[in-house]
């Protein structure tokens, strides 16, 4: 029994020496004693290749490469102890979830924390750490007793409570495992116990290579190996000079020095012979003087400079994507020009979550075979999502999001249907569920679902159309596709008495859905498209899910569990599933994490993402215990993993390892922005490298090749897939700025695409975008007639929409596009309710021959409650009755109607105008409808403007009859003559024109009436600020002022007094007008003469004719208006359709100038020739 150290700096040949010794021994004695070669898990594959890479050694039974966990399997198979069931990470998380749920009420700190994302991952890591550091539950309990007895501060009490929770959960976990199961950490403890019984290890020659430190658990394994083996050889990256000096935590080799001393101490304790250490002083790895210099002087202070050309390259990239593309181009160059193989190249990085997706995409585009040494989670695979969402459907009462997450996995689809057809139908089905607010019991009820197109609150026709019946049948068919398998599983889960039966219910759910066949179809499709990675995913996921169910049954099969706990535990297990890495092929670029990689002897290394806070890593407190808490436990004798401070001290060694992997070339790069455009800073590590290599230039990598020289641009020509975007970029430059010197070269590349049989069609679609202009072409007369017909019948709102944006009008009224209907109460629904409620109250008053003035406040309250109760079942598929929240909202809406009724009562008492008609239709046909506003357009098309007028008021005096329009609005609004001029506010003046043109309708003896004005009535329940001692009357007066109607009224003092008979001088509390003492109007009055009203009405006719002409002539310009801070695009539903983009030459707003009312009126006169 002896111990031998082989030490040396990086690249000194430690592994090579050991491998050569083994190979020589195998050549001399192929059947001698066992030779064990122990390496970290990540090194096993490459070490096996290296071991049998010699021409004289093509294979061996005597020598085997192991990691500690693989050695545990080997020994336990030999001597026994492997009969207990292995539980993987997913199983551990599931068991911990169950333990936490059952212990929840007794936990002090983790009761709420258990609901946070990642909690069980951290808890599992903490328990694994306890085991690796030989800390038992009883040790943790003793620590809690010690802490609890001496806790005085809040921080100490928190730590004591945290340790108490950990002790409870750790103890329960160990009790659940004992005698039945083994987790990955238990294998190492068993290995310690079983190694003395192993004949396989006894007398073996043992090499331990590639480690820098050992956990206490691993150190115990090393102890047993030294006792059982003939000789143990351990390699450590360590400078011999360091051993001659006192240990300093700032030393580069501090960690490996401690490891060296710990192992020697173990050897002394076991009286193991310690052979003379073999120090290796040469640098055989490095074929480059620059890399040899970097390794030899890495830790020197001040930095030792290397002058002259170096094989170290530094790149700064515009962004992360440009950085990865730069790496891809250089890899292709090395392979093409310098005879590198892909396996000679490695890419090292730390923040893989930012890079992996981009690297997969770009390396595939650049045709670079690659292997990412990182396990991917299965959480996004359709099968995992299907199980998780189906369980959430059942435990969460059939919520919309869970149902359609399950639907979108496409595993609920019948096996024999076309997926494309089913997707379209399910999209329609989802729209129905959103519109009708389908969830909860409606899914499980046997009552068929109904489909009716919503028309209006006044539509009481119960007849169903053929198209509605057809849609209803489809909806119920699709409902059964979705709910039938889930309801079957739901019934089985509710009947289940044990976890085993619940797992069986999940399995039967998958089997009845033909999931294995569907996954096989997905695998075949992936293989046919050349995506072999995803093809294997579909195989792995089924096996892992079945293994998870087996583990669940093995651990907890006979236990009873609530459905919610079963769902939580299953979800926790599913989240922990990972795809196994496919072993790399013989010729791939290796992409690996800096902290976990153990690669060696690659020719070129690319270290990417070298940004501040990443390399070196910024300090982060992660996991269950903070650094301060770890220090407290360490002081009390419990050794755990290194603190953040210790980890930061080890960063220099990690970076040293990182830059000493390559034999010939080292590339270091960092992006200046991430994928979202956020600024990133270069790491101080790059500055260190620049100081060591002052002649090395920092090259900037960009995706914009315009500023590069011709020779630099040539490097951007890679694969056809990648190069096409750069061709586009250059041709865009030519299009905008004309000929450039380098463009002739890019014309040659362009000619390749247009002449290549393979690429001609593919590239034409992309290149056609060069001449793309986001401009809508005018419709032909024939198309316009097909869309709009020979007779246009439209509302005033439609005409205003055209003037806001012609393309929005085309999308809504030409193409009939609309957003999908969602079961929610929007502003239009509330507006419709307000209109209907006030109309019902007014109709009741008319039937009773009463007016608003006749109502008492109590009657206002009663009537508002009655009409809201009548309307609620009719509005938006009974939305106001659908939940407690909406019931509360119904009460708030009733209060608004009540308040509005009171104000209308006050207005009626103060006004000579009385309502003579409500919700007056014009151009609608039928009894009571006024005629439309009709136009004969120059191209022969007839146009009718139709609509519905909220309220018509009439007043009479000795000067004649006056009519005014009242429009109810759920938001504050005034009449802006500038918007009238631009055709954006035509509604009120149109209504006034219609009623004055048909004045005889409301006059007993016929005749004409004069326009009295147009006013907006704001329906709301305002809050007013008053002094503390204000009386109720004063408060009511302030509220009344909040309801002052804005608009435009006739500039006649008598008419204004008819509107507010309390007005003598000053401002009216009812309308936006006021009188001075001399009888003239105040400056703030919104008034117009009768002649001006006539001009305005004439202008409205003129505007409608122009709009009708443009519509019928096919004008669909993408030209939204912008006026001050208002723009047509702000609330437009069609932005994703028109793709309006101000950065494009053809896309600019129509900027409308704001004007005073007098200026707008003058322009209106000019347009119509008015006086």
From Swiss-Prot:
According to the record, cofactor stoichiometry and binding are noted as: Binds 1 [4Fe-4S] cluster.
Q: Keywords on this record?
A: 4Fe-4S, ATP-binding, DNA damage, DNA repair, DNA-binding, Exonuclease, Helicase, Hydrolase, Iron, Iron-sulfur, Metal-binding, Nuclease, Nucleotide-binding
Query: What does the entry list as the binding residues for [4Fe-4S] cluster?
Result: 805, 1129, 1132, 1138
The family database entries (Pfam families) matched by this protein are listed as: ADDB_N (PF21445), PDDEXK_1 (PF12705), UvrD_C (PF13361)
Q: Tell me if Glycoprotein is a UniProt keyword of this record.
A: no
* EC number(s) given by UniProt: 3.1.-.-
Query: Could you tell me the Gene Ontology terms of the biological process aspect for this record?
Result: double-strand break repair via homologous recombination
Q: Which cofactor does it need?
A: Mg(2+); [4Fe-4S] cluster
Any one GO molecular-function label of the UniProt entry: helicase activity
Identify the residues that the record assigns to the UvrD-like helicase C-terminal domain, covering every copy. Answer: 281-587
* Residues the record lists as binding ATP: 8-15
Q: Give every UvrD-like helicase ATP-binding domain span.
A: 1-390
Q: What else is known?
A: Despite having conserved helicase domains, this subunit does not have helicase activity.
* Family matches, as PANTHER family: RECBCD ENZYME SUBUNIT RECC (PTHR30591:SF1)
Function description: The heterodimer acts as both an ATP-dependent DNA helicase and an ATP-dependent, dual-direction single-stranded exonuclease. Recognizes the chi site generating a DNA molecule suitable for the initiation of homologous recombination. The AddB subunit has 5' -> 3' nuclease activity but not helicase activity.
Instruction: Report the family membership.
Output: Belongs to the helicase family. AddB/RexB type 1 subfamily.
How it assembles, according to the record, is:
Heterodimer of AddA and AddB.
This protein's name: ATP-dependent helicase/deoxyribonuclease subunit B
Q: Which organism is it from?
A: Bacillus cereus (strain ATCC 10987 / NRS 248)
Q: Which gene encodes it?
A: addB
